[in-house]
Design a protein with these regions (language model features):
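ATP-binding glycine-rich loop module of kinase domains
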Residues: 14-71, 99-108
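Activation segment/activation loop of eukaryotic-type protein kinase catalytic domains
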Residues: 141-182
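Surface-exposed loop/turn elements that mediate protein-protein interactions on large endomembrane-trafficking
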Residues: 302-321, 340-357, 377-395, 412-432, ...
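Juxta-kinase regulatory segment immediately upstream of eukaryotic protein kinase catalytic domains
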Residues: 1-16, 49
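Catalytic-loop of the protein kinase fold
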Residues: 125, 129-146
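C-terminal lobe helix-coil module of Hanks-type protein kinase domains
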Residues: 182, 190-263
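Repeated scaffold domains used in trafficking and secretory/extracellular systems
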Residues: 320-330, 356-369, 392-407, 427-442, ...
Length: 592
């Protein structure tokens, strides 16, 4: 694709792609980002009207905004002079949604660091509001966190200013006062709606739960609880096990949150929040109270029993840590890596690294070996703390491309998928854009370019990729996960479309046939056992059945609710039990 900037013609290719959403693609070019809108069909009258409003916004975009607002620096045009998009500063980092993921945060990003991020974001919002600019669609996918810089606001071209509306708002961050309101006609957002979204993000990042998350006996969904102003600060809302209790927060923070979520107070975040100081108790709990609320309630010598029973569910603690679980796999038994006291060790206590993981580093388990990938794509195979092999893999926007099983390790080299064990080329993929997973017998991956998804299946130890034409989606890719048994694969993809998170799932046979698919499902990791599907949710384990090619929700095993959440990884065992890998523990669940 050719675009024209002030410097002349620029060619953008798939290898330069940084990200893709429902509205545009973003490319890397000479240290800057070029956002190119998707083409609109001449027959699409609504789409052409929306694009016209977008171009008007670009022409009237305010100048002199804070450098943390990644607005247009110049326009990108076609050879005829038509506006195709714009150029903005390129920033490398993670979206703010990662701050609400406990497996990502624990041991790496403290609550004090989170407080600093949001203190700086509050300053940016105050400046914007003073200039008459409202973010509108403020959500954790539009905020980029990059070290001590920022945070940065992206998608600035959708902001509300100069009488031009912000046409969309993400439902998880949208002020309930705007539910059911047409956002596209006139300006509907105001500074108060930004502060509501800000409060949702801060609360979720401190406590790992949405303020209207959890489960409630009568108000069954997050949106219904938001409409009723019934937050997790109420005692009748059951928190997911991944969440930290709101009782870890200071009174000043709780007072503001209650006002925002339950009384429609829309005041800016008070400065007292940024003086919140967290401490970590010897029990591992991070809190901002004079005394640890967990130890105060249970007593300093209280311990959690190794076996817990609720109804039909028995939960056995296989491993607990005051550090964090880094990664886990089911490979002839449960294998995992723990980071504790600044050291990484395997499940048998053997050394992996005598230091913490750096930002951008990832681990993958391959039998007795542990593969470490770094932010530049460098790979090392570690055994007992020693490097026994080195390699290199490609980098995608989500990180280094690497997948491993007991006897299989896969990486990429330019446009090729490589079997690291044999050195053979398995098949062609898209350089820098491929997602990849492998089980013991089957592997799965996909790449996207130009709004088109190419998914593929392969068998470990063999060459050749089987394309999966029945797998595809639209919208911005938020996350993806795959699970396997000996003859099946389950792909779960979450996208953001028109302000909603949509969960898609495909159950695949070993030949690549789509046995069933489901769309708009519950969030949560999936697991497979002989073709049977179960997902972990904040309400407990939920089985999925197949009906006429559709994945349909079956039984919700509510007795499992205290032991599993949507953020936990599920690893099935051959005896029918399920291993749940949390942020700081590994549990074995059995149903009688």
């Amino acid at each position: 694709m050719d675009v024209y900037l002030s410097s002349g013609r620029v060619r953008l290719g798939d290898a330069d792609l940084v990200g893709e959403g429902g509205e545009a693609r973003v490319f890397r070019h000479q240290g800057r980002a070029v956002k190119v809108f998707h083409p609109v069909s001449p027959q699409d009258a609504v789409g052409r009207a929306v694009r016209a409003k977008k171009l008007e916004k670009l022409s009237r975009f305010p100048t002199g905004l804070p450098p943390t607002v990644l607005g247009p620096q110049e326009l990108a045009r076609s050879a005829r002079g038509d506006v195709l998009g714009f150029v903005m500063r390129l920033v490398q980092g993670d979206d703010a949604g990662r701050l609400a993921q406990r497996r990502f945060r624990d041991g790496r990003v403290s609550n004090d660091a989170v407080t600093g991020v949001f203190a700086r974001l509050s300053q940016t919002l105050a400046v914007l509001h003073g200039r008459g600019v409202v973010v509108g669609d403020l959500n954790d996918g539009n905020v980029l966190v990059s070290g001590d810089e920022g945070p940065f606001l992206i998608d600035a071209d959708s902001m509300q200013f100069d009488g031009l509306p912000c046409a969309v708002g993400h439902e998880r961050f949208l002020d309930p006062r705007l539910y059911g309101v047409d956002l596209s006609t006139v300006p509907r957002f105001d500074p108060g709606t930004d502060w509501f979204a800000f409060a949702v993000m801060l609360f979720s990042s401190w406590l790992y739960v949405h303020p209207f998350g959890g489960t409630h006996a009568k108000l069954g969904t997050l949106l219904r609880r938001a409409e009723a102003r019934h937050s997790v600060l109420r005692d009748d809302v059951v928190l997911p096990r991944v969440a930290a209790s709101w009782k870890t927060l200071p009174d000043e923070a709780l007072h503001w949150f209650r006002g925002v979520f339950e009384a429609d107070v829309r005041s800016p975040a008070p400065d007292v929040l940024w003086r919140t100081a967290f401490t970590t108790c010897r029990c591992g709990l991070e809190h901002a109270r004079p005394a640890c609320p967990a130890c105060h309630a249970l007593g300093p010598l209280a311990t959690r029993p190794a076996v817990r029973v609720k109804g039909r569910c028995t939960a056995r603690v296989l491993r607990q840590t005051t550090g964090r679980m880094v990664t886990a796999a089911m490979q002839g038994g449960v294998r995992f890596v723990i980071e504790e006291d600044g050291v990484l060790r395997r499940e048998d206590g053997s050394l992996v690294l005598e230091r913490r993981l750096d930002a951008g580093e990832r681990l993958a388990i391959a039998g007795a070996s542990t593969w470490l990938s770094d932010a530049r794509g460098g790979l090392v195979r570690l055994e007992n703390g020693r490097v026994v092999e080195r390699a290199q893999t490609g980098l995608a926007p989500h990180g280094p491309i690497l997948a491993a099983a007991t006897q299989a390790v896969y990486r990429t080299e330019h446009e090729w998928l490589i079997d690291q064990v044999t050195g053979a080329r398995v098949g062609q993929v898209l350089e820098g854009q491929t997602w990849l997973w492998t089980g013991e017998r089957l592997g799965l991956g996909f790449y996207r370019a130009g709004g088109v998804t190419v998914a593929f299946l392969f068998k470990t130890g063999r060459a050749g990729l089987k394309q999966l034409p029945g797998v595809g989606w639209s919208g911005r890719l938020v996350s993806a996960h795959a699970a396997f048994d000996a003859r099946h694969a389950l792909l779960t993809v979450t996208t953001e479309t028109s302000g909603r998170d949509v969960v898609h799932r495909w159950l695949l046979s070993e030949t690549g046939e789509v046995l069933a698919a489901g769309h708009d499902g519950r969030a949560g990791h999936g697991a497979l056992l002989q073709g049977r599907v179960v997902i972990g949710t904040d309400a407990g384990l939920v089985s999925l059945g197949v009906s006429s090619g559709v994945l349909v929700e079956g039984t919700c095993f509510t007795d499992t609710q205290p032991f599993v959440s949507a953020q936990d990884e599920l690893l099935p065992q051959s005896d029918g039990s399920l291993v749940v890998v949390g942020a700081r523990d590994v549990l074995q669940l059995s149903l009688s």
